[in-house]
């Protein structure tokens, strides 16, 4: 493993990162919080997190690690491309990832002690704004690399459009909490599409080594 190339590691990160993140995310959303709990209802979410404290902590750790792995892959994609737009975008991806990891840490803290329930508002806000910044960065990276001959431009434009949708849902959910549950559902669908594209791009990156 010590001699693995930058492209191979970056490709693996693009494949494994989003898949693992998706698995832990859905375990937390479906297995810990539940589909009937509105994320805007802080008391209900806190009750669900503390009732499943071990799983809350494990999924928060899993999501955090997977997001960092994914970030490495995206940064490698931007560095390999070398264009100005994706270079800017990876800064946004970095900040968005940091926000998500902080939010995951606060979520784990809530799960560990019901007295930390007051942190939920902060965790939710950081998560929401982290998603906005990350989506903007991902959009810039996708647009930046779309002109490269090893990237399918038409598919890249579709993914860029999905990133715009993700960005809009983040903004709408941030301004109007009553829409948060619906916006997060749409955002989850966007992330699934991101994951499929990331796997494709990751496989191609490994092949370019």
Please give the residue ranges for each predicted region:
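Hydrophobic, aromatic-enriched alpha-helical segments typical of multi-pass transmembrane helices
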Residues: 2-209
